[in-house]
Amino acid sequence: MGIARKPEVMSPAGYWPQLEAALDAGADAVYFGLRHFTARAKVGFGLGELPQAMAALHRRGARGFVTFNTLVFDHELREAARALAAIAEAGADAIIVQDLGVLKLARAIAPDLELHASTQMSVTSAAGVRLAESLGARRVTLARELSLADVRAIRAETRCELEIFVHGALCVACSGQCFSSEAWGGRSANRGQCAQACRLPYELVVDGKVKPLGDARYLLSPGDLFALRQIPEIVGIGISAVKIEGRYKDADYVALATRAYRQAVDAAWEGREASIDTRQELDLEQVYSRGWGPHFLNGTDHQAVVRGRAPRHRGVRMGRVTAISETGVTIEPADAHRLSPLKPGDGVVFDAADWRSPQEPEEGGRIFEVLPRGGAMELRFANRALDPARIRRGDLVWRTNDPELEKRIRALPAERLPVSVRVNAREGAPLIAVWEAGGIQVTVESAAPLGAARNRALDAELLREQFSRLGNTVYALADLELAVEGAPFAPASLLNQLRRDAVERLEAAAAAPRRIEIRDPMTTLDEIVSIGMCDRVDRRKRLSHFAGEAMGQAFSPANSSGSGDPPPSLHLLVRTAEQLDAAIDFRPASITLDYLDLYGLKPSLERVRAAGLCPRVASPRILKPGEERVVDFLLSCDCPILVRSAGLLDTLRGRPHAALVGDFSLNAANAITAGELLALGLDSLTPTHDLNAAQVADLARAVGAARCETVAFHHLPVFHTEHCVFCRFLSTGSSYRDCGRPCDEHRLALRDSSGRAHPVMADVGCRNTVFGAEAQQASAHLEAWLSAGIRHFRLEFAHESAAQVVAVSQAFADALGGRLDSGELARKLARVSPMGITEGSLFVPPDYLELPVLQ
């Protein structure tokens, strides 16, 4: 696919100051959220402010994209439908969506409104792009874990618009696949409530023992993305938009980052070499940085993405401490000091060099005086601003704040919208001027014919002099064409009035809301739900029992209970050969194999078959370009597949396959989404872990409980990450090619400040999953789930031994068979689980049905 058009520079806005900063710096588009249904809670515009925000954007020739990129629960769908209609009515240029149900709802309410698939959709392949496009997305924001080679491969296989992040914070977990906030804080990253557990300190536990890592404590905290130097290559790939992260960042950050990428994109598009100097990089680093690089865009390097020293803004490294005295701190300056010297008023922090825990508060403050000391310099501070005892020789010095830079940013000239003017001036006829800016064209003309000039006739110089007086507007005169017949005379007053009229009309036309079809949101929602119910009833008529192949022998008619309902069945997911031995002895309805090495599990599959049991195989949660062989392998297993990505689901639609069970990672949070996924070919579905136990039951009733498989015991997969902790901290390698595969030899866990050790496991793609230390279990909710008609219960094991697998499985079998009440089940599970048990995400808060009304 050729390069169709220049990529948009897309900037973030938390509120008005950031929006205005983005426009002044030349953003083509600005993305922002409302107060709810957005992946960045606590920032955004009120619904009543949206028309004003869109008008401000359109007056500057920019587009406005509203983020609606969270999962939406069933009880919120009516409020969501009203919000979607209001967003369309306000003139939004696009809505950025995570939830497949919201995608369908938005398309039905406003068929002409542009829809973008959020990075929260976890799209990492051409198949994922095609699926999003088939469901109505015009643009897809690709996952930040992709390399430029991956992006180029996806571009070659698709025609949909693609967008990538080029600057700002990185999440350690794949977007849309993080459940740490849900597990540990009762709040969800998929709901805009990220608790930033990745920025907390952890100890590395290897085979049961803590491994010293020096000053590396923040083992899941990645540095920031900085891809300014990769822009020429990105433009050459044919990307539709380059995106700057940062809806929580301030206006200075937005202004500086937008201007830098604006200049880089313009230069690359015009074939010019980008003029990126060290001072510009230092300014960007100063305004906000945790340490940065192109990271995944340049390919895998697990040594570079996470340094582990600090999780917060560092700014620019300005030197190293050489001496400490009662009057001040002497430092040897770094190269950055030559371009951007330290000065009074700067804020600095002293970064302890291997002698103090990075978790402790750091010494720092504002410089009062800078004194040269030969090649060094002494920094002095106000009285008692520092504790000299907490600073030592060798400590790094970072400038975290530069007031002078802030002044320079705010003094930068605002980008203007170029305007072209074509003028026809003929003696004896009205003067006609056509003004065009940002794709909008208006025509103004004089009320009376032009007379003959007695002295100076109208010429281009006079016209430019009057029409270029646009200082208090958003426009700048770029091109002027004049066609003259005779020697017409046009007074300056007339030209000035025509200029004012043209500007007024351009601004009015730009700010006018786009007129698109908007259907009644409540009627539309009711129609979608009604049609979905009919489809589900029809499917149930065609499926007398649910996916017998996928669910194992327990679901044959011979095993049904007298009431016509099948008995409850257990499905075990195992990750080790030892666990498999125990699972086969237990004889569940099915056994799902979720092994590190896919290519070593076929003998295990045969063992399950030989035992007369139903085998299933789990797919990776992420599949990238070049990993298509994994799909071939999954199909060659000739057994049901636990599908964990939408891209894989799309790929399997076109190929013969056994039964498909959709996993939690598909993020089915409401009945519309669940219906869409089932319609795409799934035989059953596991709800997202963002739902509490009551919501799981409600969703099962809505979609048909026979098609729901719930997880009743597991360690919540809190992080799923491209970054490999094994490679980073147990090797000197950068990827699987040179790491020596420590994941084959060692058991790993991350121990948090409370002493909980969270298991870490790698998959076939070397991606890591960090599991919650405590076992999440549904003992308190089994009765309610059974009452909702749920009969499929999955038990998943991480580091459990064979004995623990047997004990947990037997306890659930006894509970489902009526031989154990919920309290006894919980007590048994607690005795089996060394780190304890928890309700975790299944906990049902008393106020969970309350949704703040959008203002």
Located regions from the model:
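Surface-exposed amphipathic alpha-helical tracts and adjacent flexible/coil segments at the periphery
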Residues: 1-24, 29-39, 53-54, 60-67, ...
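Conserved phosphate-binding/catalytic loop of the ribokinase/pfkB sugar-kinase fold
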Residues: 121, 125
